[in-house]
């Protein structure tokens, strides 16, 4: 229901996503998304990694004040309105909006890696869900204090 409401709110974006089977399929399977990503002035998304290399991520910059950039691996790129960036988010990446006040907005689209055949999407989805659980367990749970572990 929410997806249908969002398609009505953003018909041009919905049409764009509909024209990209590798993106719409991933979103419909619940392992990808198409969303507007806003980053407030002065914000920094700390270094992080996605959970899988079975997908790629596209950023289409829509509103870009001065001082907005992304680092993927060792490469830093400036955001420029209308200039598409595609990257594998399983590599460490971080984002800055160094403008003191203005918001940066990108259309973020995740889509199947082109090396994965459509016939493999269902099996890959299952593997991705398992990888996400492991990734969250490894990155979101605090490490166990050694003093709390039972003696062996």
Give names to the regions the model predicted.
Residues 58:
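Structured ligand/cofactor/substrate-binding pocket environments in proteins
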Residues 62-64, 89, 99-101:
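Short loop/turn positions at the edges of beta-strands in beta-sheet-rich folds
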């Amino acid at each position: 229901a929410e997806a249908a409401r969002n398609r009505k709110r953003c018909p041009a974006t919905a049409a764009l996503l509909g024209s990209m089977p590798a993106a719409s399929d991933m979103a419909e399977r619940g392992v990808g998304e198409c969303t507007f990503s806003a980053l407030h002035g002065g914000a920094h998304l700390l270094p992080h990694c996605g959970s899988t290399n079975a997908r790629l991520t596209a950023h289409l910059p829509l509103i870009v004040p001065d001082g907005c950039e992304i680092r993927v691996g060792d490469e830093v790129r400036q955001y420029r309105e209308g200039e598409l960036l595609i990257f594998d988010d399983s590599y460490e990446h971080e984002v800055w909006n160094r403008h003191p006040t203005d918001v940066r907005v990108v259309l973020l689209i995740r889509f199947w890696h082109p090396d994965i055949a459509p016939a493999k999407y269902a099996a890959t989805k299952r593997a991705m869900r398992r990888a996400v659980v492991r990734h969250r367990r490894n990155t979101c749970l605090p490490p166990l204090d050694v003093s709390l572990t039972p003696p062996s």
